[in-house]
UniProtKB/Swiss-Prot annotation:
Superkingdom of the source species: Eukaryota
Ranges of Low complexity composition bias in the record: 196-209, 383-401, 679-690
This protein's record includes keyword Signal: no
Role summary: May negatively regulate the snf1 kinase.
Organism: Aspergillus terreus (strain NIH 2624 / FGSC A1156)
Protein name (Swiss-Prot/TrEMBL): Protein sip5
PANTHER family with a match to the protein in the record: PROTEIN SIP5 (PTHR31315:SF1)
Gene giving rise to this polypeptide: sip5
Region described as Disordered: 1-76, 153-231, 243-262, 314-340, 383-409, 506-531, 546-759
UniProt-listed InterPro entries: Sip5/DA2
UniProt family annotation: Belongs to the SIP5 family.
Keywords: Cytoplasm
Subcellular location field: Cytoplasm
GO cellular component assignments: cytoplasm
Length: 797
């Protein structure tokens, strides 16, 4: 395809390349021939089983490559575990320090994350107790062979039986020859070449004394050079070799040496000597020799197995607002302002007994020395035998000092005799730095994601800027600004600041002014400090944006709650108005409504009493209309003095509309009968309820009032029809007075709700006719009066 080589041309090209480079690579021809044979394998041989099957090999290779990361890690951990087991067995078999071991004894099965090289060095220097073998049980009455069996991990024999493997003979007395041989061995072990005075020791030890071997061989790279002979180097090369040799020379650590093997101490086996006064570790509850570590603060015993398990906690956010106290002493002051922003911390390990920080221990070695030791160095520190002793022993193989009495004061964590937990784990600072960097990367990535989402939501059209997330989660600009529209750059200051922080390269097609182009920062360099500064600025702007957003959300929430409260109050007011309207329509308090009858409303004349003692309604107050009698038309009524405004009653046809006339005369003023009003109100309320049950659909939808209006004309017609056959049996009182007075005007107006405040106008129908036509048989002994709750009820014109 295109310019690529085809399959037929590849072997020729590779053949030409191999011939062209034959002088430089003598193995190229062989590789080419092997590749040709592998590519040109005969299929017939593979069928016969002679040639190899490529498919099977490919499948095996793919299966081998399908190993997951967890499987690789598990296989690696298993390999390391097997190597540790072998190394532990070898060390316990060949190495020891004063009867103790340099490897753990399996008291704790967790991960050994302490620095084993440092622990080994401290134990060989007798500054830290070795890993003694712990005893599950101990008795002061045990004999020597029982102590030996317990120390070697063998079954404890009876006191009077000595197993063959525990038999021992007393050490032979030292003769003169043995003394001389021992002295020569000691001198041989203690003789150390002085490497600080001369640099020729390393070269003499690494090269042979034969001068011919010091010459370069013909096959060496020096001999292949054609510029000059190796014996005549230039001055620059000589100076360079001397300089590099000084800088590249590794300072060799202290050289380990094995002391003469002596299994006895003061004529006793070393195990019996160590464990005859065993003491218990207060943490693991195992019995060890009395030569244990002592805490620097409270002088409590602790074995090395427990000591190496105590460490700083894992990196975590600071608690209770404490300052970061995990920085080294020399750099703590400089890092204090930087650690006040809630970074991860690792508090120093505390003492398990007195909970004092900066946990450390001291060690007083036994009075003898066996096993491994370091060759003496005149420049090395003196070997202190106890923390409270100022004497030192430089070359004594058997110091006669014994552990001193218990300290009365605590030692400082910076004391040279104190071994702290940070000493055996020097990588805690790097671990903390890595955790902080990881947390910072995650925080920056999250901030970048939030910022990107904010910018995308703020600019839904997406025509001003295009952003994408980079490898580390930091936003990078993926392209130039689309189009030359400069108005798309306008936005909130926070949006512009965030865009400035996330876009460090100037736009190519932007139409901004030259000043804005000049104010943009230069392209981002590969400097970590610049990235950190940008991330800090971005995080600050994000915090400001979140604060503004939270304030806006709080304001909207308050407005929403205020609207909800207002709506609730309005709803409650509507409910109260509706309840008041219901109580006004069907007056539950008949006496109150009857006692407060306005003087402007008409009354229905009772058939059982005279109206001479009651006050007539004045014609000048309110707008009263006469209801039309169904039996007699309004124009034939002798009491109708003149025509007034026509009143349109809902439910009536236009041909049935009649004119209403005001009252022609008023009755003389007299004391009103309140008891009659009460009786009339109660009688009319029962009448209205009975009529509402018989005629539920009397009101039409054309009325402006929400309450139903009764068609009083139809009601009067029904009453009139019922009265016609029973007119002869009707009992009438005061007939003469009623005839002399003539037919009075009857005014009936429906009651309206007091909650309307007099704003609703309810149409009223004036009915004029004889008293006999208006009063049915059922109400012959009752007085009926229509009262309204509103004082300003007006008839619609």
């Amino acid at each position: 395809m295109g310019n690529s080589q085809t399959k037929e041309s590849r072997p020729a090209a590779s053949h030409r390349r191999s011939h062209g480079g034959a002088g430089r690579s003598p193995y190229s021809e062989r590789h080419h021939s092997e590749g040709s044979r592998s590519r040109g394998s005969r299929p017939d041989l593979s069928i016969l089983g002679i040639g190899g099957s490529h498919h099977e090999r490919d499948v095996a290779t793919l299966e081998h490559r399908r190993e997951t990361r967890q499987e690789r890690e598990a296989r690696k951990l298993e390999k390391e575990r097997i190597a540790r087991v072998k190394e532990r067995e070898r060390s316990m078999r060949e190495e020891h320090v004063d009867g103790g071991y340099l490897v753990t004894q399996g008291v704790y099965t967790g991960t050994e994350d302490f620095n084993k090289a440092i622990v080994r060095q401290l134990m060989i220097e007798r500054r830290l107790a070795p890993f003694w073998r712990g005893l599950n049980d101990f008795s002061e009455s045990w004999t020597e062979h029982q102590l030996m069996a317990a120390a070697r991990g063998l079954p404890i024999p009876p006191p009077d039986e000595i197993p063959p493997e525990l038999e021992y003979t007393n050490p032979p007395k030292a003769t003169d020859d043995s003394k001389e041989s021992a002295d020569s061995k000691m001198i041989q072990h203690l003789t150390v070449p002085i490497t600080s005075r001369s640099q020729s020791y390393g070269s003499d030890a690494s090269q042979s004394s034969n001068p011919t071997n010091s010459l370069p061989s013909p096959a060496s790279p020096i001999a292949s050079g054609t510029s000059s002979s190796p014996l005549f180097r230039t001055r620059a090369k000589t100076l360079a070799s001397l300089t590099t040799s000084k800088h590249n020379q590794v300072d060799p650590g202290p050289r380990e040496m094995q002391l003469p093997r002596d299994p006895f101490v003061n004529g006793q086996p070393i195990e019996a000597y160590l464990y005859k006064e065993a003491s218990e570790c207060p943490i693991c509850f195992l019995y060890y020799p009395p030569y244990l570590n002592r805490t620097r603060c409270c002088d409590q015993p602790i074995c090395s197995e427990c000591f190496v398990q105590i460490k700083r906690p894992d990196p975590h956010p600071p608690e209770h607002g404490d300052a970061d106290s995990n920085a080294p002493a020399e750099s703590q002051e400089g890092e204090r302002p930087e650690n006040q922003d809630g970074q991860l911390v690792m508090e120093p390990a505390a003492c398990p007994f007195c909970v004092q920080p900066e946990f450390g221990v001291t060690y007083a070695p036994p009075p003898f020395r066996r096993g491994l030791t370091y060759a003496l160095d005149p420049n090395s520190r003196p070997n202190f035998t106890s923390p409270v002793s100022s004497t030192s022993s430089l070359a004594s193989a058997n110091p006669a000092t014994v552990p001193g009495r218990r300290r009365a004061t605590s030692l400082s964590a910076s004391d040279p005799l104190v071994i702290t937990t940070d000493r055996i784990r020097p990588d805690w600072a790097q671990k903390l730095a890595n955790a902080r960097a990881h947390a910072a990367r995650r925080s920056a990535a999250a901030t970048a994601l939030h910022t990107a989402a904010y910018l995308m939501n703020s600019n839904p059209t997406g025509d001003s800027r295009n952003f994408s997330l980079g490898r580390r989660g930091v936003m990078r600009r993926s392209g130039a600004v689309e189009g030359g529209n400069s108005s798309s750059r306008t936005g909130s200051p926070a949006l512009q600041a965030l865009a400035f922080l996330t876009d460090r390269r100037p736009a190519g097609t932007d139409t901004d002014s030259a000043e804005e182009q000049g104010n943009l920062a230069p392209p981002r360099q590969s400097s970590r400090r610049n990235r950190i500064d940008d991330l800090e600025e971005m995080m600050m702007m994000e915090a400001i944006r979140l604060s503004l957003a939270s304030e806006e959300e709080r304001r909207k929430r308050e407005e929403k709650e205020a609207k909800k409260d207002a709506k609730k109050r309005e709803k409650e007011a509507k409910k109260a108005e509706k309840a008041a309207r219901k109580t006004g329509m069907y007056s539950n308090n008949a006496s109150g409504s009857a006692l407060d009858v306005p003087s402007g409303l008409g009354r229905v004349v009772s058939s059982s009493s005279s109206i001479t003692g009651e006050e007539a309604t004045p014609a000048g107050k309110g707008k009263e209309v006469d209801r039309v009698s169904p039996n007699a038309p309004a124009e034939n009524d002798p009491g109708a003095a003149g025509a007034s405004d026509a009143v349109q009653v809902p439910g009536l046809n236009s041909t049935e509309q009649h004119h209403s006339a005001p009252l022609s005369s008023a009755q003389p003023t007299s004391r009103p009968s309140h008891l009659r009003n009460v009786s009339s109100a109660s009688s009319f309320s029962s009448l209205v309820e009975s009529m509402s049950e018989d005629h539920p659909g009397a009101a039409e939808g054309t009325s402006s009032s929400p309450e139903p209006l009764y068609n009083f004309r139809s009601l009067a017609a029904v009453i009139g029809d019922d009265e016609k056959p029973e007119e002869a049996a009707e009992h009438v009182e005061d007939t003469l007075s009623q005839k002399a007075e003539g037919s009075g005007t009857q005014s009936v107006s429906p009651a309206t709700d007091s909650a309307l405040g007099g704003t609703a106008e309810i149409p009223c129908v004036t009915v004029e006719g004889d008293r006999d036509c208006l009063i049915p048989k059922e109400l012959e002994t009752r007085s009926v009066e229509l009262t309204g709750a509103t004082r300003n009820a007006e008839a619609t014109s």
